[in-house]
């Protein structure tokens, strides 16, 4: 009898022990679960928010939900904007590094071909200084169509938002037109002389054709179309180009190239030749790309003043080379 009672007590003890252990484990598990669910919002604030929600009308609840959604969307937009900005900064840094390397290797920076100070200086040269340059560059020209001795009839131009008034006349020399156009429109005479040489080699031509004078600055003469007759003639080309540059300044947003931004600039009219992102550093360089929308590829730069490959274009490369040869570094 005593033995049976002892065994029963032992079984009860074992049973009780298991139950106690289970309870202990359950308490630990419960504590862990509670810890996992612990809110980051303070208890008092949770209670206040709950009371506010419970007391709110349907309209107020809808307003609270809408406010929360708007705040969430705004936060997401801010984060997305920051991500884009950081990505843009990385792209700009990479573009600037590539441009710096090109400048070191070839003395050409596609993002800073010429400084604003050098470009927008309408008093860079006097009429006499322009004539001296024409005489020097055209020293081997002896015919009756040399730019240094040619004269033209010019038309008076009223002042407008782009240029000051230009007083026309009979038998104006090329030097007078270049000086007066640059002075009226605030464009460097050095730039105008450089473009005349870049586009039609008029400064050094020994027997220039009528077409060279008609399209002297390449104004409204795209690579893939005929020239606009409205701008034909030496005066129309020189004065028109100076005015067009100022038009570009005031309407830059209408064009594809912008200062202080990354711009994709192609190497060639053929899109298959590719291009690269260029961080354009100033307005003058942006205007050159609006006027001539291509950059030299590496083959063109390696060639110096020579020819590159089938994808090479030379307009902006030649601008830098010609300007530098006559007037020094265009970036100074």
Task: Annotate each PLM feature.
Residues 2-11, 17, 23-28, 33, ...:
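Non-catalytic cell-wall polysaccharide-engagement segments
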Residues 114, 118-179, 184, 191-193, ...:
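Peptidoglycan-targeting cell-wall enzymes and recognition modules
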């Amino acid at each position: 009898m005593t033995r049976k009672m002892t065994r029963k007590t032992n079984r009860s003890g074992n049973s009780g022990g298991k139950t106690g252990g289970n309870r202990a484990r359950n308490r630990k598990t419960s504590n862990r679960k509670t810890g996992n669910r612990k809110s980051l919002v303070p208890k008092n604030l949770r209670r206040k928010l709950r009371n506010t929600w419970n007391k709110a009308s349907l309209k107020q609840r809808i307003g609270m939900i809408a406010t929360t959604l708007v705040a969430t969307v705004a936060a997401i937009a801010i984060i997305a904007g920051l991500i884009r900005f950081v990505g843009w900064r990385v792209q700009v840094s990479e573009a600037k590094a590539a441009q710096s390397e090109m400048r070191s290797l070839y003395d050409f920076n596609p993002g800073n071909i010429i400084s604003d100070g050098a470009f927008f200086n309408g008093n860079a040269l006097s009429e006499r200084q322009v004539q001296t340059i024409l005489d020097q560059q055209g020293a081997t020209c002896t015919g009756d169509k040399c730019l240094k001795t040619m004269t033209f009839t010019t038309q008076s131009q009223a002042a407008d938002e782009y240029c000051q008034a230009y007083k026309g006349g009979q038998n104006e020399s090329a030097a007078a037109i270049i000086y007066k156009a640059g002075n009226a429109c605030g464009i460097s005479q050095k730039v105008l002389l450089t473009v005349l040489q870049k586009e039609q080699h008029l400064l050094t031509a020994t027997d220039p054709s009528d077409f060279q004078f008609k399209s002297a600055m390449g104004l409204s003469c795209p690579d893939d179309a005929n020239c606009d007759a409205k701008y034909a003639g030496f005066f129309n080309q020189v004065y028109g180009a100076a005015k067009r540059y100022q038009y570009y300044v005031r309407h830059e947003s209408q064009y594809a190239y912008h200062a202080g931004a990354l711009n994709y600039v192609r190497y060639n009219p053929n899109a298959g030749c590719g291009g690269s992102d260029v961080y354009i550093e100033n307005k003058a360089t942006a205007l050159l790309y609006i006027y001539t929308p291509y950059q030299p590829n590496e083959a063109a730069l390696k060639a110096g003043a020579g020819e590159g490959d089938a994808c090479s274009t030379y307009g902006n490369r030649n601008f830098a080379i010609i300007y530098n040869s006559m007037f020094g570094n265009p970036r100074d």
